[in-house]
Amino acid sequence: MSHSGAAIFEKVSGIIAINEDVSPAELTWRSTDGDKVHTVVLSTIDKLQATPASSEKMMLRLIGKVDESKKRKDNEGNEVVPKPQRHMFSFNNRTVMDNIKMTLQQIISRYKDADIYEEKRRREESAQHTETPMSSSSVTAGTPTPHLDTPQLNNGAPLINTAKLDDSLSKEKLLTNLKLQQSLLKGNKVLMKVFQETVINAGLPPSEFWSTRIPLLRAFALSTSQKVGPYNVLSTIKPVASSENKVNVNLSREKILNIFENYPIVKKAYTDNVPKNFKEPEFWARFFSSKLFRKLRGEKIMQNDRGDVIIDRYLTLDQEFDRKDDDMLLHPVKKIIDLDGNIQDDPVVRGNRPDFTMQPGVDINGNSDGTVDILKGMNRLSEKMIMALKNEYSRTNLQNKSNITNDEEDEDNDERNELKIDDLNESYKTNYAIIHLKRNAHEKTTDNDAKSSADSIKNADLKVSNQQMLQQLSLVMDNLINKLDLNQVVPNNEVSNKINKRVITAIKINAKQAKHNNVNSALGSFVDNTSQANELEVKSTLPIDLLESCRMLHTTCCEFLKHFYIHFQSGEQKQASTVKKLYNHLKDCIEKLNELFQDVLNGDGESMSNTCTAYLKPVLNSITLATHKYDEYFNEYNNNSN
């Protein structure tokens, strides 16, 4: 669209032109002979009127704003508002007038919205309201947005540093990450109750509590640190036209930051013009109506499309940015897989230049319609977004194999072998050597002898009596409970590590199969994907409050028992004080269990007490066994020292 054209002002012919290079923009009319010049500052215009399309006359009227400070009083003492200044232009061409009118509408609308925003800010400052950052704003052909000098997202700080993921997920960092632990406790009510009973009420150190839940912390940290990666932000922004030739755009602060990150040319245009040439809302209004916006979005730019004079200057600069990106993304490709390079180097296959009808995006005159440039721009943006993720989630450590141990390298090779596509490889065929056996005459048997031996085996008494079965079971249980010592099963650490590795490999394979086949790993059966929260509990004769007390006491006892065996079986002398504290906690657990049994017996009767005792008897026996082991080793140590 044109920004200039022939117009008549005060019955004098001339040329009217809109100058957007200055701030604020100006409309200048100059007579044909150059003697008369009339300039209108568009920021002072309040209304724009035009004759309808059905009228033979073609005129534009610009009505200026009324200055409230210049009110005056008449002879009767009443305040009289001064008349606004009017500018009338006549045209001889309907197309020229429509183009000028549309340009003036957009410019005047931007200034009016900026005035509304300034008035709103003045009211807020007068009312002494602190300005809070907005989660999203509406850019309406110049609607202001919060200033972006110090951007702050409302999502909050991440719980871990994803750029250094290996370091953030280490045991030391997880044990000292209090925010991560607090977030996990807030989201898991059951774990929160266990934490209150064991750490807050019973005095278990928090480091001990979390030391057995490192995998849980690590999984929670990974699940909460997931974030949206880079994407084509401009493709999600859709300007919507409204009344008064305004364009409404919903633009959040996060999208603005993503635009600056993915499109450096937009950030450069922003820093060059805000607040030097115009305010931030006017910048976004100009940007969304510019050709640069349509180009970055992946749309074709037609010759008749109207853009923005200032923002569209960065189109040529954007080409320089594209060339720099191409050089940065350029990487060598071997000729054995560079098919495009092979075709270009083959003169026989390539032949003469294809006809213009076979060239993509080129007309008969050899002019490009921009399709290839759009595709190249989208590919360039995709590569940049992928390159932006190379430092996220410790991807840079994948190529650094200097610190990888043999076991980790073997696991890495196993995973790579699983990912290989071996469908086209030749399958290995086993070749067997045929061996012919010759029997002697005295070793040959007849068919009748074979039948008789089979009948004798079939008729044999293979039944096992109940007494024999009970004897065998008691023998196995006696060996497992009294004679088997798990500490002496694998005395060599090397053998233990190999066995652990085989077990972990088997678990991985079974887990993949179970996930694929929807198999419950605990029951070994096919299950539905229904949530466990919807499952009904097993019926119990105990009241709900008593049952919940038994559960919490059982969980607390198991927690202390687990930590006791971890330190007790370590064999380290420096753990003696910790084992002593845990031993005292186990003694307290025994007292709490006995108190609960006695309270239930006195308050609810013998039958209820028997049920409660049956529930908690296994954990009581386990704690008693642990305390007996500690007393035994403690007495043995004292006797040896004496």
UniProtKB/Swiss-Prot annotation:
- Locate the compositionally biased regions of type Polar residues: 129-143
Gene Ontology BP terms: DNA repair; nucleotide-excision repair; transcription by RNA polymerase I; transcription by RNA polymerase II; transcription initiation at RNA polymerase II promoter
Entry's localization field: Nucleus
Q: Name one GO cellular component term.
A: transcription factor TFIIH core complex
- The protein's superkingdom reads Eukaryota
**Cross-referenced CDD domains:** PH_TFIIH (cd13229)
On whether DNA damage is a keyword of this UniProt record, the answer is yes
Residues in domain BSD? 165-221, 243-295
Q: Where is the composition biased (Basic and acidic residues)?
A: 65-76
* Primary location group: nucleus
Keyword Transcription regulation among UniProt keywords: yes
Q: Which SUPFAM superfamilies match?
A: BSD domain-like, PH domain-like
Family the entry assigns: Belongs to the TFB1 family.
How does this chain assemble?
Component of the 7-subunit TFIIH core complex composed of XPB/SSL2, XPD/RAD3, SSL1, TFB1, TFB2, TFB4 and TFB5, which is active in NER. The core complex associates with the 3-subunit CTD-kinase module TFIIK composed of CCL1, KIN28 and TFB3 to form the 10-subunit holoenzyme (holo-TFIIH) active in transcription. An additionnal subunit, TFB6, plays a role in the dissociation of the SSL2 helicase from TFIIH after transcription initiation. TFB1 interacts with XPC/RAD4. XPC/RAD4 recruits TFIIH to the NER machinery. Interacts with the NER 3'-endonuclease XPG/RAD2.
Further comment: Present with 5150 molecules/cell in log phase SD medium.
Protein name, as recorded? General transcription and DNA repair factor IIH subunit TFB1
